[in-house]
Regions:
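Structured mid-to-C-terminal alpha-helical surface segments
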Residues: 1-46, 56-69, 73-267
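Active-site glycine-centered loops adjacent to acidic/histidine catalytic or metal-binding residues
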Residues: 51
Length: 267
């Protein structure tokens, strides 16, 4: 994809994002657009998920920058089918140097390499997992929108806000990174608590974990309490437009803890 340096610089200044992030945003949206066109021939087989899906489809003007795109391939957990699909998809993406497929646990991963206007090289990472479809709500067909490049993509099924938030809460419980805190804090008020509880139940089954919702939320709270807000701020602020950056990550953390406690109390 050809990138216009001056346009990218203007966007970087406007949103307070690093220039290389703006380069990647254009390429990320381009790759997602190509994937939408390629998979339109097999509707319903690929579902958009993860932080990029949550931010681009639901958080809108509060969205942060995202580095990669994650998808679930709806199968009966066939490794051969996952490999075949991923290899075919990678071969049909144009305008990038595509790396060899590699398996990372239960996921097939490849990189779409591109050159930047400054002479450097970067990539968009694509992760595809094989999953059975277990959702609290039907899949959505929301427009995927970049507030930074003002580009949009349609045609890829996406999990509901509750199903995406349940998966983000799983990431929060496991690693409690700043991106997870930001995403869950922004998404939780948009969720129906009743639907979210069901979404967490299905998510835990999908991950092969035998755990009650109450126990899972307790674990998320405990993990978040141990997190370092200063470290979160330093690592995550570059991914958030300057106008949307939390004034205090300590307050953001405490606010989310209160929200999670309220959610748990209503279970």
């Amino acid at each position: 994809m050809e990138l216009d340096l001056e346009i990218c610089r203007t966007i970087a200044i406007r949103y307070g994002l690093p220039l290389q992030f703006v380069f990647k945003e254009f390429c990320l949206m381009d790759v997602i657009s190509q994937i939408a066109a390629i998979t339109a021939r097999e509707p319903g087989s690929l579902v958009f998920k993860g932080g990029t899906a949550l931010n681009k489809a639901y958080l809108q003007k509060m969205q942060r920058f995202s580095e990669d795109a994650d998808f679930d391939l709806v199968t009966k957990n066939s490794d051969k089918e996952l490999y075949r699909f991923s290899k075919k998809l990678a071969s049909e993406i144009n305008g990038y140097m595509i790396t060899e497929l590699r398996r990372v646990r239960y996921t097939m991963q490849f990189y779409c390499m591109y050159g930047t206007p400054l002479g450097g090289e970067d990539h968009v990472r694509i992760d595809i997992s094989s999953k059975r479809l277990r959702t609290a709500k039907p899949l959505e067909n929301n427009m995927i929108i970049s507030e930074f490049t003002h580009s949009s993509v349609s045609g890829i099924p996406i999990y509901s806000i509750e199903d995406l938030t349940a998966r983000k809460m799983h990431a929060l419980a496991d690693r409690a990174e700043g991106k997870d805190l930001y995403d869950v804090h922004m998404a939780l008020p948009m969720c129906s608590n009743k639907v979210l509880k069901t979404a967490i139940e299905f998510m835990l089954k999908s991950e092969g974990e035998e755990e009650a919702v109450d126990s899972f939320v307790q674990r998320s709270i405990a993990r978040l309490k141990k997190s370092d807000p200063k470290k979160m701020r330093n690592l995550t602020n570059p991914f958030i437009p300057s106008a949307s950056r939390p004034k205090s990550w300590e307050e953001l953390k405490n606010d989310l803890l209160a929200m999670l406690e309220d959610f748990r109390a209503g279970l």
